[in-house]
Amino acid sequence: AYGIVSNVTDEKSVQDMVDEIVEKFGRLDVLVNNAGISQKVTVEDMTLDDMKRIFNVNMFGLFLVTQKCMKVMRAQKYGRIVNLSSVSGKRGGGIFGGAHYSASKAAVLAFSKNLSREICAEGITVNSVCPGLINTEIWKSLPKEEADKVIDGIPMGRPGETQEVANAIVFLASKEASYITGEEIDINGGSHMD
Protein backbone atom coordinates (compact mmCIF):
# COMPACT_ATOMS: atom_id res chain seq x y z
CA ALA A 1 0.00 0.00 0.00
CA TYR A 2 1.07 3.52 -0.72
CA GLY A 3 -0.65 6.42 1.02
CA ILE A 4 -0.86 10.03 -0.10
CA VAL A 5 -2.52 12.81 1.87
CA SER A 6 -4.56 15.16 -0.29
CA ASN A 7 -7.24 17.80 0.18
CA VAL A 8 -9.89 16.98 -2.43
CA THR A 9 -11.22 20.55 -2.29
CA ASP A 10 -7.87 22.05 -3.32
CA GLU A 11 -7.00 21.79 -7.02
CA LYS A 12 -3.22 21.99 -6.51
CA SER A 13 -3.31 19.32 -3.79
CA VAL A 14 -5.29 17.03 -6.10
CA GLN A 15 -2.95 17.61 -9.05
CA ASP A 16 0.09 16.96 -6.84
CA MET A 17 -1.49 13.67 -5.70
CA VAL A 18 -2.14 12.52 -9.27
CA ASP A 19 1.37 13.54 -10.35
CA GLU A 20 2.87 11.57 -7.46
CA ILE A 21 0.84 8.46 -8.33
CA VAL A 22 1.87 8.58 -11.99
CA GLU A 23 5.51 9.23 -11.07
CA LYS A 24 5.56 6.27 -8.66
CA PHE A 25 3.52 3.74 -10.68
CA GLY A 26 3.69 4.98 -14.27
CA ARG A 27 -0.09 4.80 -14.73
CA LEU A 28 -3.41 5.21 -13.00
CA ASP A 29 -5.98 2.48 -13.65
CA VAL A 30 -8.61 2.84 -10.92
CA LEU A 31 -10.14 5.80 -9.12
CA VAL A 32 -12.52 5.25 -6.20
CA ASN A 33 -14.00 8.56 -5.09
CA ASN A 34 -14.74 7.86 -1.43
CA ALA A 35 -14.18 11.23 0.26
CA GLY A 36 -17.36 12.50 1.82
CA ILE A 37 -18.84 14.33 4.77
CA SER A 38 -22.30 14.59 6.27
CA GLN A 39 -24.22 16.69 8.76
CA LYS A 40 -27.55 16.03 10.45
CA VAL A 41 -29.52 19.26 10.16
CA THR A 42 -32.96 20.26 8.88
CA VAL A 43 -33.36 22.54 5.88
CA GLU A 44 -34.82 25.20 8.16
CA ASP A 45 -31.72 25.18 10.38
CA MET A 46 -29.18 24.71 7.57
CA THR A 47 -26.98 27.62 6.54
CA LEU A 48 -25.63 28.38 3.10
CA ASP A 49 -22.16 27.67 4.49
CA ASP A 50 -23.38 24.21 5.58
CA MET A 51 -24.59 23.53 2.03
CA LYS A 52 -21.34 24.77 0.48
CA ARG A 53 -19.18 22.72 2.87
CA ILE A 54 -20.99 19.47 2.04
CA PHE A 55 -20.94 20.13 -1.73
CA ASN A 56 -17.29 21.23 -1.66
CA VAL A 57 -16.21 17.78 -0.49
CA ASN A 58 -18.92 15.43 -1.77
CA MET A 59 -19.36 16.83 -5.28
CA PHE A 60 -16.75 19.46 -6.13
CA GLY A 61 -13.94 17.40 -4.59
CA LEU A 62 -15.10 14.38 -6.57
CA PHE A 63 -15.13 16.53 -9.71
CA LEU A 64 -11.56 17.78 -9.16
CA VAL A 65 -10.12 14.33 -8.48
CA THR A 66 -12.00 12.80 -11.41
CA GLN A 67 -10.97 15.55 -13.82
CA LYS A 68 -7.27 15.18 -12.98
CA CYS A 69 -7.31 11.36 -13.00
CA MET A 70 -9.30 11.00 -16.20
CA LYS A 71 -6.64 12.91 -18.14
CA VAL A 72 -4.19 10.14 -17.28
CA MET A 73 -6.76 7.44 -18.03
CA ARG A 74 -7.58 8.99 -21.41
CA ALA A 75 -3.91 9.02 -22.38
CA GLN A 76 -3.60 5.31 -21.56
CA LYS A 77 -7.05 4.48 -23.05
CA TYR A 78 -8.07 2.58 -19.93
CA GLY A 79 -9.57 3.35 -16.58
CA ARG A 80 -12.19 2.51 -14.00
CA ILE A 81 -13.91 5.24 -12.00
CA VAL A 82 -16.17 4.23 -9.11
CA ASN A 83 -17.97 7.00 -7.25
CA LEU A 84 -19.54 6.55 -3.84
CA SER A 85 -23.01 8.01 -3.70
CA SER A 86 -25.65 6.92 -1.20
CA VAL A 87 -29.16 5.55 -0.97
CA SER A 88 -29.93 9.06 0.32
CA GLY A 89 -29.03 10.43 -3.10
CA LYS A 90 -31.71 8.26 -4.67
CA ARG A 91 -34.58 8.58 -2.24
CA GLY A 92 -33.76 11.63 -0.11
CA GLY A 93 -33.53 11.65 3.62
CA GLY A 94 -31.08 9.81 5.70
CA ILE A 95 -30.24 8.77 9.20
CA PHE A 96 -27.00 10.69 9.44
CA GLY A 97 -27.37 13.48 6.88
CA GLY A 98 -29.58 16.36 5.85
CA ALA A 99 -31.00 17.51 2.52
CA HIS A 100 -27.63 18.96 1.51
CA TYR A 101 -26.02 15.53 1.89
CA SER A 102 -28.78 13.86 -0.15
CA ALA A 103 -28.55 16.55 -2.84
CA SER A 104 -24.76 16.19 -3.07
CA LYS A 105 -25.06 12.42 -3.47
CA ALA A 106 -27.78 12.82 -6.13
CA ALA A 107 -25.42 15.17 -7.96
CA VAL A 108 -22.76 12.44 -7.89
CA LEU A 109 -25.17 10.09 -9.70
CA ALA A 110 -26.01 12.61 -12.43
CA PHE A 111 -22.35 13.57 -12.85
CA SER A 112 -21.33 9.91 -13.13
CA LYS A 113 -23.86 9.12 -15.85
CA ASN A 114 -22.92 12.19 -17.85
CA LEU A 115 -19.19 11.50 -17.56
CA SER A 116 -19.75 7.88 -18.54
CA ARG A 117 -21.33 9.01 -21.81
CA GLU A 118 -18.41 11.38 -22.44
CA ILE A 119 -15.56 8.90 -22.00
CA CYS A 120 -16.78 5.29 -22.18
CA ALA A 121 -15.73 4.91 -25.83
CA GLU A 122 -12.15 5.54 -24.67
CA GLY A 123 -11.96 2.41 -22.50
CA ILE A 124 -12.96 4.18 -19.28
CA THR A 125 -16.00 3.10 -17.28
CA VAL A 126 -17.75 5.28 -14.71
CA ASN A 127 -20.11 3.74 -12.18
CA SER A 128 -21.54 4.54 -8.76
CA VAL A 129 -22.29 2.53 -5.66
CA CYS A 130 -25.12 3.59 -3.37
CA PRO A 131 -24.67 2.15 0.11
CA GLY A 132 -27.49 2.21 2.59
CA LEU A 133 -26.91 1.67 6.28
CA ILE A 134 -23.43 0.21 6.81
CA ASN A 135 -22.03 -1.19 10.06
CA THR A 136 -19.58 1.58 10.99
CA GLU A 137 -18.72 3.46 14.17
CA ILE A 138 -21.44 6.03 13.46
CA TRP A 139 -24.02 3.25 13.22
CA LYS A 140 -22.79 1.69 16.44
CA SER A 141 -23.20 5.04 18.23
CA LEU A 142 -26.97 5.17 17.63
CA PRO A 143 -29.19 4.58 20.67
CA LYS A 144 -30.75 1.07 20.58
CA GLU A 145 -34.31 2.34 20.11
CA GLU A 146 -33.31 4.41 17.08
CA ALA A 147 -31.17 1.58 15.69
CA ASP A 148 -34.05 -0.91 15.99
CA LYS A 149 -36.33 1.48 14.09
CA VAL A 150 -33.79 1.75 11.26
CA ILE A 151 -33.33 -2.03 11.06
CA ASP A 152 -37.10 -2.46 10.80
CA GLY A 153 -36.92 -0.60 7.47
CA ILE A 154 -34.34 -2.99 6.01
CA PRO A 155 -35.87 -6.20 4.58
CA MET A 156 -32.64 -8.13 5.22
CA GLY A 157 -32.92 -7.11 8.88
CA ARG A 158 -29.34 -5.90 9.37
CA PRO A 159 -26.88 -3.21 8.38
CA GLY A 160 -24.47 -3.93 5.55
CA GLU A 161 -20.82 -4.64 6.17
CA THR A 162 -18.00 -2.53 4.76
CA GLN A 163 -16.67 -5.60 2.96
CA GLU A 164 -19.96 -5.90 1.07
CA VAL A 165 -19.51 -2.37 -0.26
CA ALA A 166 -15.86 -3.11 -1.06
CA ASN A 167 -16.85 -6.24 -3.00
CA ALA A 168 -19.04 -4.20 -5.35
CA ILE A 169 -16.30 -1.61 -5.83
CA VAL A 170 -13.68 -4.27 -6.59
CA PHE A 171 -15.99 -5.82 -9.18
CA LEU A 172 -16.71 -2.48 -10.89
CA ALA A 173 -12.97 -1.72 -10.91
CA SER A 174 -12.15 -5.05 -12.55
CA LYS A 175 -11.79 -6.04 -16.19
CA GLU A 176 -14.81 -8.30 -15.67
CA ALA A 177 -16.96 -5.15 -15.51
CA SER A 178 -15.66 -3.81 -18.83
CA TYR A 179 -19.15 -3.54 -20.38
CA ILE A 180 -20.78 -1.91 -17.36
CA THR A 181 -20.84 1.88 -17.31
CA GLY A 182 -23.17 4.60 -16.09
CA GLU A 183 -24.70 2.24 -13.55
CA GLU A 184 -25.75 2.69 -9.94
CA ILE A 185 -25.29 -0.37 -7.72
CA ASP A 186 -27.53 -0.37 -4.64
CA ILE A 187 -26.03 -1.96 -1.53
CA ASN A 188 -28.75 -1.52 1.05
CA GLY A 189 -30.29 -4.83 2.07
CA GLY A 190 -33.46 -4.04 0.13
CA SER A 191 -34.29 -0.79 1.91
CA HIS A 192 -34.51 0.96 -1.48
CA MET A 193 -35.23 -0.81 -4.74
CA ASP A 194 -35.42 0.83 -8.19
Predicted regions located by residue number:
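Active-site helix of classical SDR
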Residues: 66, 104, 112
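C-terminal helical subdomain
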Residues: 109, 121, 128, 149-176, ...
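Residue(s) in the substrate-gating loop at a strand-loop-helix junction
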Residues: 86
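Conserved NAD(P)H cofactor-binding loop of Rossmann-fold oxidoreductase domains
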Residues: 35-39, 190
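Alpha-helical segment proximal to the catalytic Tyr-Lys
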Residues: 71, 113, 117-121, 178
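The beta1-alpha1 cofactor-binding region of Rossmann-like NAD(H)/NADP(H)-dependent oxidoreductases
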Residues: 5-16, 48, 163-164
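Substrate-binding pocket helix/loop in short-chain dehydrogenase/reductase
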Residues: 42-43, 50-55, 139, 146, ...
